[in-house]
Amino acid sequence: MEKEESTNKNNENIQSENEINKIDNKSNTENPTIKCIFKKPNKQRNIRKRSDDLILNTSNNADEEDEDGNEEKDKKKLKSKINQYTTKQDKKNEFSYDSSGNAGSSINSAELSSTQYMNEEEEFKKEVVLSSSRNNNNNNNNNNNNNNDNISNSEGSGGSDNNDDGIYRGMKSYSTFVEKKSDLTYKGGGVKAGPMKTSTTFKLSNRIDHQPDVCKDYKQTGQCTFGDACKFLHDRSDYKSGWQIDKEYEEEQKQKRLNNINGIKNNNNDNKNNDDDKEQQQFPFACFICKKQYVDPVQTKCKHFFCEDCALTHNRKNKKCALCGEPTLGTFITPPKKILDQLMEISKSHFKNQS
């Protein structure tokens, strides 16, 4: 029976295939109909394509906005409620009476527990921050003290034991030969009280030579265009500044040493007396122009003496010295008091003897 049913099915399939082939042959023999297929238009064909960078940026911005929104929501949730009452109606709404007549708050126990938890969490965070800052300060102070102790130990031992190992222990482990005082400047954690300690490696000594400001014009010529309004000192006395005195003293000491080495005796006093006698002999007893006794004697640059009136009248005619012919440039100096007195004594004694 089963074989017969299978043969019948095969025959039916064969017949159906033959019919389909006949229909296809007829369609091929007949006039073929043209079928047009249109592609569906794209809805977004007029929209310009966006670059990949813009898409990434927009997606990142959207993610950031979502994160900011979530953070703001979290902050709003974390804000604790402040139990502050301003009116009686709010108090009535907040509080209710139980069946037993006892007053109780209408706030849920869950809300109270959440607010208490948030307050406790904030206080805990503050305590953690304060404790961490204190620990950091204490650690810094301990490190500084330990370093100073190590340095002092190395100094006490001479630094020979530590440095001969060949192990590098940092810059602070070098042996220092300068003693450090136990001041706050060294052991205070960033706190420096009082003045800083001066360096012990070198010392500096200053010497300041204070000398008055002398008017140069008045000292050389005896005249100043500013007059009494001049801020400099009007002084014509000869004096040496500090550096000149020191220089002369050093030269004298050098000369003494050389003389002692060569076996020459020091005869400075005798030489000075001889020089003074020669100078007194060199002073002229009368003015070269008027051939008379000096009246207000004046000295030129070439160290020749004339009367003041005689020198000025001669300068109007000739700008050179009357004796040697060197240019005076119109400058006449009044000699120092010591030389003036000697000059006047010589001239007076000469003219007295003649009379």
Curated annotation (Swiss-Prot):
Biological process terms in GO annotation: snoRNA splicing
Keywords for this protein: Metal-binding, Zinc, Zinc-finger
Keyword check for Chloroplast: no
GO MF entry, a single one: zinc ion binding
CDD domains linked to this entry: RING-HC_RNF113A_B
Cited Pfam families: zf-C3HC4_3 (PF13920), zf-CCCH (PF00642)
RING-type zinc finger segments: 287-325
Cellular-component GO terms for this entry: nucleus; U2-type spliceosomal complex
Biased composition (Low complexity): 8-18, 99-110, 131-155, 259-271
Zinc finger (C3H1-type) residue numbers: 214-237
Ranges of compositional bias, category Basic residues: 37-48
Gene3D superfamilies named in the record: Zinc finger, CCCH-type, Zinc/RING finger domain, C3HC4 (zinc finger)
InterPro entries named in the record: CWC24-like, Znf_CCCH, Znf_CCCH_sf, Znf_RING, Znf_RING/FYVE/PHD, Znf_RING_CS
Region (Disordered): 1-167, 258-277
Stretches with biased composition (Acidic residues): 62-71
Signal peptide (UniProt feature, chain positions): none
Protein name: RING finger protein 113 homolog
Species assigned in the record: Dictyostelium discoideum (Social amoeba)
